[in-house]
From Swiss-Prot:
Subcellular localization: Cytoplasm
Domain of life, per lineage: Bacteria
Protein name: tRNA uridine 5-carboxymethylaminomethyl modification enzyme MnmG
InterPro entries recorded: FAD/NAD-bd_sf (IPR036188), GIDA_C_N (IPR049312), MnmG (IPR004416), MnmG-rel (IPR002218), MnmG-rel_CS (IPR020595), MnmG_C (IPR026904), MnmG_C_subdom (IPR047001), MnmG_C_subdom_sf (IPR044920)
Cofactor(s) the protein requires to work: FAD
Main location: cytoplasm
UniProt-listed Pfam families: GIDA, GIDA_C_1st, SAM_GIDA_C
Quaternary structure note: Homodimer. Heterotetramer of two MnmE and two MnmG subunits.
Disulphide-bonded residues: none
The keyword tRNA processing appears for this protein: yes
Amino acid sequence: MEYFSERYDVIVIGAGHAGCEAGLAAARMGCRTLMCTMNLDSIGFMPCNPNIGGTAKGHLVREIDALGGEMGVNIDATFIQSRMLNTSKGPAVHSLRAQADKRNYSGRMKSVLERQHNLDLKQLEVVGIRIDNEGKVCGVITKNGAYFETKTIVLSTGTYLKGKVIIGDVSYSSGPNGFMPANDLSQSLLDLGIEIRRFKTGTPARVNRRSVDFSKMIEQPGDKRIVPFSFMSENLDRKQVSCYLTYTTENTTKVIRENINRSPLFNGSIKSVGPRYCPSIEDKIVRFPNKENHQIFIEPEGEDTNELYVDGASTSMPEDVQIAMYRTIIGLENVEFLRTGYAIEYDCINPLQLRPTLEFKKVEGLFGAGQLNGSSGYEEAASQGIIAGINAALKVKGKEPFILKRSDAYIGVLIDDLVTKGTEEPYRMMTSRSEYRLILRQDNADLRLTEMGYKIGLVTKERYDKYLERKNSIETEIKRIKNLYITPKKEVIEFLNSLGSSELKKSISLYELIKRPELDYFKLQLLDMDRPELNEDVQEEVNIISKYEGYIKKQLEQVQQFKKFENKFIPENIDYDEIKGLRIEANQKLKKIRPISIGQASRISGVSPADISVLLVYLEKKHREKLL
């Protein structure tokens, strides 16, 4: 029996990493928001790796934080180890990564949601989406018959839609980690004309700490200097736990090869597509037959648990094969399983059905975020969640949508790739996907995005004031060192020689001196005795801006060229069949994706530079005729 329950501005379906950011963004922007989850104990849960960040992913977390999101604050409060990756390389690829206490991460996120003004949290299963006569969303129906009216919906269902767990020849309907699957909602999406596909992902076994011989492994402690994810976090000095590096052996390869016919990945049981950059251990053995061993990282899942995550050994092999295989890994000879590894297949959508706002083209007011859109990873999900939540709120308020360009943020790259190019496999963010890596660094996320977040009403006054203080400190110090001249005195020349730097021929500003490859802002402190006391993050920003000024300037010039095409908008009512000279493939792709700008159109696979020229001529002609 159906009954009317309540009325909301925004309803978020799912409370994983995408759902949490979407719900918080909408509520913090003043919309009455309902977050639905099938299990209140699964909020912000980490069903796979127990960490946040990593290469490129750390950039995403910083960007979420700069916009006023929660992920960075949450991991800063609950991490058990912190490391900055890629420090031997340039600042563009430095990426922060933190091990999380999984239980505490989820618990704190739930607490934040429960305390959030404008946000209601309910345990219920949504089985249907209702639309009105104009094709706009108007509500959702739950399994228990409750009807909730709404203006907008954010779908963030993760791997729950028709989830199916596979372990060898055993398979059963399930969500991740034993949670219930959502088996009814997919049909509602199909009824709305939304294209559904199947992807798969997997996770390794969890093993008992007491059965692991760490003496055979290489300890990997956290960094002594802890760098926070959130620009709001301070004083994060705390005791950290270690991770451990170990390796597979010849016997690992032998066990897998002898049982490869029992692998659902290779015997045809799994037909869906998995993540390219997170292959299972059996997939790695088959794909790299000449590699003698593979790295395995042993990672704690929390401070108060014996569960260890075996990173690098994701598998869907039968349980007996998993145990035999794991016991061939160095240090795991007597390992005991606490949870078996598995693969999980799930329904998701073709992201080409989405606008850059993450709203479905076919259904007004319906937004998609996270693994539903074909991505993989907590950080990718949260990035889409905050954008979907922002745009759902802006739609309710009747305001212009919020779209991050590729030159604004990695989040912009992620979403543009999904909605413009689509993906045939779970999409993972990487620094190599961005054309503008040097200006999209993790250290300057606040300088790029916090102003935007404040204008749309998501960034708080407290955060904004802190951002202005940091920005002012950086600008003031840059100005100071530009006006601080170092003269070629004897002691200066001797000091520079001691650093392996050539002598000065004439006076030079400290700002210019920093640009020498062998020097930096920190090394030159002895030439700058009146240097003010500054936070380390401010000093690092000053160093990067000074040292890489030429490269940054060149990239900013490229961005200006890029924006010329990005700002040439294509009318929604354009008739591509009317454009003579477009190739058939280009016509079909443009009609399907319906790009919002020439820039987006130029990135569509199958649309050539010649097609773009034809399109530009057509738009210019129509502009002159004032018909569009």
